[in-house]
Amino acid sequence: MIDIKHLSITFDRVIFDDASITLSNNSITIIKGKSGTGKTTLLNQLGLVAPLACDYLMEGHSIEDPLTTRKEKIGYVHQESTLFNNMTIRENMKFAFLLSGQEYNETRMNDILCSMKIEHLLNQTPDHVSGGERQRAAIAFALMKDPYLLLLDEPTASLDSINCKLLIELLSDYIHTHPVCVLIATHDKRIIDYADDLYEIQNHKIVPLKKSMIEELETTSVTRKPQNYLSYYKKHLIRSSKSYIYFLV
């Protein structure tokens, strides 16, 4: 489990003001928010790529050495490509082991590539595979270090519906059998119903969405069917309390 407490960040304006969030093991947490509300800033805090502006607990312990923790325990897939086009997929994965300071483990590499359904692309370069395959390879790259925390910034934004569904389902299958916390920052409504926990950035706080909303949707058999989910939501929840309305923005 990861706990972020008392997160306060101000640049030319206030981004976060005493915000908090908890990430659970073996689960996908999704953070929503309009552009400029601080989703990427939050990922950078969790990814230890910026000076800490919060109390950060990983497995109940404070972060003593951010550089080592980031190197060994955190995988981060940015919006920009994290793969090298002058290297094959296999060479990229080997390089991921090198970056994390771990010895190359071919069995682990093959297991992860199979879990992302890209094992047949080992000898291809990233610029010669499809967009969906490339994104799954980027996630595989981040998983090679066996991270405790995996951060994904808009991972499905450029994918069609088929590849979007495949990516999020493969990721969900993987993390529910591995002790990893996953945080996804996204605008993509197609993947919202895959979240174990949902948050939205509002008024400089990280606000949890009510679990009852998810449970009601599950009883209607629309879970994991994004189009039906959105239709149901509009028909049955739009007249409910104002605390729900921001979810559609």
Predicted regions and their residues:
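ABC ATPase NBD coupling module
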Residues: 63-75, 99
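ABC-family nucleotide-binding domains
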Residues: 160
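Conserved ABC ATPase signature
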Residues: 125-129, 133
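Catalytic Walker B motif of ABC-type/P-loop ATPase nucleotide-binding domains
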Residues: 150-153
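Conserved ABC ATPase "signature" region
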Residues: 106-121
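Helix-to-loop junction immediately C-terminal to a conserved catalytic motif
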Residues: 47
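Hydrophobic anchor residue at the start of the ABC signature
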Residues: 139, 185
